[in-house]
């Protein structure tokens, strides 16, 4: 039951975070960010947000820095939009799955040549 609720809250957070990051964050360091996944612990205390960023490595690091500075604002926005007793503590991480998928696709394409 706790896992089902955590999954529902993660999906709701993913939707709300996408809107918050695209419309509310005015930091120029935060560029084109896509929320790819959100994992919430069973006790709803921690939320790990996976993001992908369009740009080079410096742009990714700047975006992560901008998001970490705006973490309090983002958490309060989530708290206002989703009715929870306590809003989960948010951490941002890069989603490496897209890059790994592209790398594997390139390798497979090279093998077929």
UniProtKB/Swiss-Prot annotation:
Subcellular location field: Cytoplasm
RNA-binding keyword on record: no
One Gene Ontology term from the biological process aspect of the record: maturation of SSU-rRNA
Coiled coil stretches, renumbered: none
GO MF, one annotated term: ribosomal small subunit binding
GO cellular component annotations of the record: cytosol
Keyword set, alphabetical order: Cytoplasm, Ribosome biogenesis
Function, in words: One of several proteins that assist in the late maturation steps of the functional core of the 30S ribosomal subunit. Associates with free 30S ribosomal subunits (but not with 30S subunits that are part of 70S ribosomes or polysomes). Required for efficient processing of 16S rRNA. May interact with the 5'-terminal helix region of 16S rRNA.
Family: Belongs to the RbfA family.
Subunit and partners: Monomer. Binds 30S ribosomal subunits, but not 50S ribosomal subunits or 70S ribosomes.
Protein's UniProt name: Ribosome-binding factor A
UniProt organism field: Oceanobacillus iheyensis (strain DSM 14371 / CIP 107618 / JCM 11309 / KCTC 3954 / HTE831)
